[in-house]
Design a protein with these regions (language model features):
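Conserved phosphotransfer microenvironments
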Residues: 20-25, 44-48, 56-95, 107-109
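Conserved N-terminal alpha-helix of the aminotransferase class I/II PLP-enzyme fold
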Residues: 192-241
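Conserved acidic residues
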Residues: 56-59, 115-126, 130, 230
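N-terminal "arm"/small-domain region of PLP-dependent enzymes with the aminotransferase-like
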Residues: 126-213
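Short beta-alpha junction loops
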Residues: 13-15, 66, 100-107, 127-128
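A short, well-structured beta->alpha microelement
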Residues: 28-53
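Alpha4 helix (beta4-alpha4-beta5 surface) of REC/receiver domains from two-component response regulators
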Residues: 72, 102-121
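Conserved acidic segment of CheY-like receiver
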Residues: 3-31, 39-40, 60
Length: 241
């Protein structure tokens, strides 16, 4: 299943015909050619507003030109705004990739606390847009895969693999609903993914709920880690309990 997590580009010159605008649009086009959606924003405004998109984005690219900086990093509005943006993003999301796009000398204006939070610095015109796009997409995909907890990731793979599901004889993976008009409506309303993912407590690809192995066992251990517990066990209400 292809989830919608665009790469967000924040650049005041995104639609301009200057050097910066042409460069960032070439990068955006290269990313779109690789199959990733781009959300281009042309106004910085309050960067903290864009930070709220951290749950919907697969990566952020912020374009900053060298001439935008003023003397003194402690009071520079660009540095202060960038720091506030990063702090707001990292407050809720420690892993989403953040890139700065700028000139070669732009990075010297940025203090270490900002540089530490970046996944990379993209030097304008130093590499081809196609290469930079592939690098950013690799990091974005790695981030999205890391977001998925063990069982959900295994369930996604199972549902996408075209595996026949006979675990629920009441609907047989949704097939039974396709035999009547109202069933078709039900199928279209809830979607095939929900019905194909309706499985029993013991699927080889997912693990055994009673034996705590496979993706189920891995998820139980992950849940125990999150809740700082010694053990965590999943149960379901039915014959398996």
């Amino acid at each position: 299943m292809k989830f919608r997590f665009p790469i967000v580009i924040i650049d005041e010159d995104f639609r301009s015909e200057n050097t910066s605008g042409l460069g960032i649009r070439a990068l955006a086009q290269a990313i779109e050619t690789e199959g990733f959606e781009i959300l281009g924003v042309t106004s910085y405004g309050d960067l903290s507003q864009f930070a709220q998109q951290q749950s919907r984005a697969s990566a952020f690219i912020l374009s900053i030109d060298d001439e935008e900086f003023t003397e003194g990093p402690d009071t520079d509005p660009v540095v202060l705004g960038l720091r506030a943006f990063i702090e707001e993003v990292r407050r809720k999301n420690a892993d989403v990739p953040i890139y700065i796009y700028g000139e070669t000398k732009t990075s010297r204006h940025l203090p270490n606390d900002i540089l530490r939070e970046l996944h990379g610095f993209i030097h304008m015109f130093e590499d081809t847009p196609e290469f930079v796009a592939r690098h950013i997409i690799r990091e974005a995909k790695s981030y999205l895969e890391g977001v998925q907890p063990p069982f959900f990731k295994a369930l996604l793979d199972y549902a996408e693999d075209g595996s026949y599901s006979w675990h629920c004889p009441g609907h047989s993976g949704g097939v039974a609903f396709l035999k009547s008009p109202v069933g078709q409506m039900y199928h279209q309303f809830y979607g095939e993914n929900m019905l194909r993912a309706d499985v029993c407590n013991a699927v080889e690809e997912l693990g055994q709920l009673l034996d705590h192995n496979g993706a189920i066992g891995e998820s139980e251990r992950n849940a125990a880690r999150i809740f700082n517990a010694d053990h965590c066990f999943f149960v379901t209400n039915g014959t398996s309990t």
